[in-house]
Each structure stands twice: as structure tokens, then as C-alpha cells.
Amino acid sequence: MSDYPMLISNKLHSFRNFALQIYKNSMSYTKRIFLKYILGTCISCFMALQGHATVRNGADQLEKLLPLLEGKQVSLVVNHTSLCGKTHLLDTLANQVKIVRVFAPEHGFRGDADAGEYIQNGKDTRTGVPILSLYGKNKKPLPSQLTGTDVVVFDIQDVGARFYTYISTLYYVMQACAENQKELIVLDRPNPCDYVDGPIREKAYKSFVGMLPIPLLHGCTLGEMAGMINGEGWLGKGLQCRLQVIRVEGWKHGQPYSLPVKPSPNLPNDLSIALYPSLCPFEGTSVSIGRGTTYPFQVIGSPALKDFFQFQFTPRSLKGFDKHPLHQNQACFGLDLRTEKELPQGFSLKYLLQFYQLYQKQYPDAEKRFFSRSQWFDLLMGTSQVRKDMIQGKTESEIRQAWEKDLQAYRSLREKYLLYE
């Protein structure tokens, strides 16, 4: 693990002691108030750093990883979240092992591409290593792309939602490794949305946003999910991936974890990540969740709802967020969830039901207007039942009954593959 957090915390210790001495010796009330503020800030920063420093991700544990790579040709599946301390994993390993190529998932190697944007192949300017995209037509490594590779290292930060596509990339990489007799090492990271909730993906709705028959919130790290994929035979044709997982140290299920790097352009902070499971299904509707603003997945609104809300936002084409957002250059009226005192935990239908009911008040053809991309909505949900139940006017508790039995079965299944308490 990088000694950067320790260095900073040592500096904070020194500054804290210095400020405390001045505070004690100062007779000025104004100075005391100011120094008290500075001292409190230092203590808060120190506590935050101490809490994060106790967690060692798989990539931080080079003492475990390097012996597994010695003398081997290595391919990496990484993006901008693949950090070893403050240094990218590729840069860390480049001078210590033979890296033959890098595979990049959705959003690209640097994590700056829009959702769904085509990613081109290229070459890393710093190391000269070829970079191959696993998003677009080629979502699975080809046999020719694994030629000369002995072991594949997978290190990407996930957010715990089934429709977040990094988990689908993991599935395809495992399948390719199994088919081509390659080892796979997963460098594990905590799950920031560590809940088990939502509908199980039905077979008819298998897609890149629903590759596996798991709940919308699966409650696993990618290391645990890799074990489940292997153990349940989901790779098909009796395939088994030669898998090793370097576990996270200092983290357990239910423990909050703030991501040090945003996992994708439109999940810029902890609030957006927490709301993502509940707001992402809006992508199958005519309601915006703030793409094209600097606060995506933190607001909800539509031009159609001017009569119901005072808060408004206007999606724009923004570099680094979204180039072509829904309702671009149109005022959207709705909710600012950044100001809400109480927000739902895990997955909730609260906002979907609220906005659909407002459309029903506004339009006789509310179903068509609201579910403007109904097929995409169903793929995100992994079932058409949620949409049908909403149209029938069912409450959230009534809708949840449809998946509760399957969810209980999944919870029992999940227990077999947990790597953490």
C-alpha cells in the first residue's frame, strides 16, 4: 500500500500539535476561535485518513501479487480506478513484470468516455503497452488477443449494481480465460453499495446490463462474484476459470467505503453512487436523472412537470460528464436530492412511483410518455414485471412481493461465496 496516507496523517499530527500549542498560549479570543476551527479540520481529516488507511485493496498488496506474476507474460483488465496507492497499477507493474497488453472496459482506460460511447484501441503513451477495448463489438477477449498471455489480472472498482457493466466485463474475461486456459487473478475491492435487494434478472432479459441471474443489488465484491460465477457454472459448457482472488484487508460487509476515485464520469461522488441503484431505471423513461449537469444521479426532473415542482435544472453537453444528455438545453422540473434530509437505502421504487403518478395526472397516455424506452427499462430491471405492476397501480410493498421469494434463495446462495464477514 502507498505510504501517502501515512505521510499526510503524520503531517496532520505535527500540525495538530503545533496549532494546539498556539491555541493554549494565545490570549486573543479571535485567534482562539480561528485556531479552534483549523484544529477541528485537522482532526476530521486525520480521522478520515485513518479510516481509509485501514483498508488495503487487492492492488495494494504487491507482496502477494508479484510472486504470482514472476516469469509470466501478463495482460491487465484495468481502468482509471486501478490504483495502487496513488499510482496506476500499469505504471506500478510495468518495470517489475512483463505486461503484454491492457484490456479496457466501458468508459475506457482513463474512464472519461460517456456511457455507451465507442472506445477505440490504442497504446499507452507512458509505457507503450497496447490497449484493447472490451466495449463495443468486442466485449470479450478474442483468442488471438490472449496469445502470449500466461495470466490476466483484473482490477476494476465496481459499485455493486447488476446493470453497472464492469461485472459483465468480468464475466466475459472469465469465460475467455477458461476457454483459452489462462489464469485469472482478481484484485478485490470493497462494494460501496453493499446491499442485497431488487428483482432477480430473468433469463429472457439477459444482456450486457444484466449478464447474470442475480438481484439488482447483489451484495458481493467482484472477487466474491467471480467465485459465484465459477461455482454456479454460469460460464457454460462446463467451463471453469483458473481463479485466484487477492482479498481486501481491513474491510467487511456492511462497512461504509468512500471511493477515492469516481468509478465512471456520471458517478462523481458518494451521493450519486448511493442513489444510482434507485435512479438508473429512469434511463428507460422520459425523466432525466441529471446527465448533462455536474450533479448526475442526484436530481430527477422532466420538462413535462413544470406545474408540480419549483426546482429546475437544464442538461447541457458537458465534457467529462455527458455529450448528448436527455432533454438537452431544456429546463427540467423535479427534485434536488442533494437537499433531501432522508434518502432511501439500497434500492427503492419511491421516486419511480412518484414520477409515474405525476405523469398519470398530467397525461391520459402516461404509460407511453413515461416509459419512453420500455424495453431498456425492462433490461435494467431484469424483468418486465416491475413496469407492469407500476402500470397497474401497485404499491412498492406489493411490487416487492413478486421478487421476495427468489431474493431469499439468492441470499442463501450468496453465503457460500462470501470472502468477508
Residue ranges: model-predicted function:
Residues 296, 301-402:
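Conserved functional hotspot residues or short segments at active or partner-binding sites
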Residues 100-106:
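Short internal beta-strands
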